[in-house]
Curated annotation (Swiss-Prot):
Subunit annotation: Homotetramer.
Main subcellular localisation: cytoplasm
HAMAP family: Arg_succ_synth_type2
The enzyme's E.C. designation: 6.3.4.5
Annotated catalysed reactions: L-citrulline + L-aspartate + ATP = 2-(N(omega)-L-arginino)succinate + AMP + diphosphate + H(+)
Similarity-based family: Belongs to the argininosuccinate synthase family. Type 2 subfamily.
Origin organism lineage: Bacteria, Pseudomonadati, Pseudomonadota, Gammaproteobacteria, Enterobacterales
Protein name as annotated: Argininosuccinate synthase
Amino acid sequence: MTTILKHLPAGQRIGIAFSGGLDTSAALLWMRQKGAVPYAYTANLGQPDEDDYDAIPRRAMEYGAENARLIDCRKQLVAEGIAAIQCGAFHNTTGGLTYFNTTPLGRAVTGTMLVAAMKEDGVNIWGDGSTYKGNDIERFYRYGLLTNAELQIYKPWLDTDFIDELGGRHEMSEFMIACGFDYKMSVEKAYSTDSNMLGATHEAKDLEFLNSSVKIVNPIMGVKFWDESVKIPAEVVTVRFEQGHPVALNGKTFSDDVEMMLEANRIGGRHGLGMSDQIENRIIEAKSRGIYEAPGMALLHIAYERLLTGIHNEDTIEQYHSHGRQLGKLLYQGRWFDSQALMLRDGLQRWVASQITGEVTLELRRGNDYSILNTVSDNLTYKPERLTMEKGDSVFSPDDRIGQLTMRNLDITDTREKLFGYAKAGLLTASSATGLPQVENLENKAK
């Protein structure tokens, strides 16, 4: 069986991930006119720039959908977002600012839940709006086939017939109008935006050029913190975790994770927290650039890692960061449910997240400027009395430290011998000042 269909399978049911935008609207109408039987599936991911989800399936029916369904994906999306925080599943960072993999998380949820809904309706051909140059085409491909082994893929944007007829937004708009739909193109922005409840991605067009900065972006989840005319008063915030799960913000307990994430977004968004500018490596190894928003994820991540550093030992923290980066890359590649990812997730959630209980107090200011004011947890292994510089009972004595330092003589001796060995091999030069070999000065070497 051919998995990827290059041309429209007339007479067959085709499920399309329908956003209600121009691209998917024109594609749905075109498929119906060409003899296919389109079914529309819309994911409610809590997109901050969408205010009427119920209207989207209605529009799909108007454009010729045999059936149209709205799938509420918010609960699952937030669950996966919290899991990513618990595991530190983030591998793209620049200057200490993190991309929280919000688009990959959204694709993991959309790609599985929409295909599961299609399967219920007996629809085994799936199309979406991803292009062949991006990451999403592979993410959706993997998640779709994981969910339905009989799935076939048809994408209008890979069909030369569709491209020849409706290859641009102007052509698609004219097509909709000619078919009796008063569809007006939205005002063109200097970049494109994709969002869900966890975060927003701004990329392409002007943002492909590195001399275009965050200042051309109009945030949809936060504020223009770089604009001095925007007043952003400082705000003290408390975040509480229980066994790795965020349960309270500013003393208010949430039984609904969706409501908790919405409130975290509101709090962080008031300050522009969690915005970052990243150059990243796409799945196909080419570099791309994006500007990201994730105010709620950033707020929870800061509090979680503060508790983490106070509760776990150094080696556990090192493994958390190392395994988290590995897991973040797998998530980015569309492998969130692969066995190697599940193995990493299980270990991080079981042995790291389970102990993260406590409350962190922060002061948020502008953008990613914040201070940690207090950290409280019954699980803290940070105990100031162990290393206090003041007089008092100590857990170890000066004689204990002398013994510990004396034991270091063994590896210091080994290291000294290694340095002289490197010098004999010509890798290091002798220093007249210290008597120890040293790396040759590059400036002197150039002379």
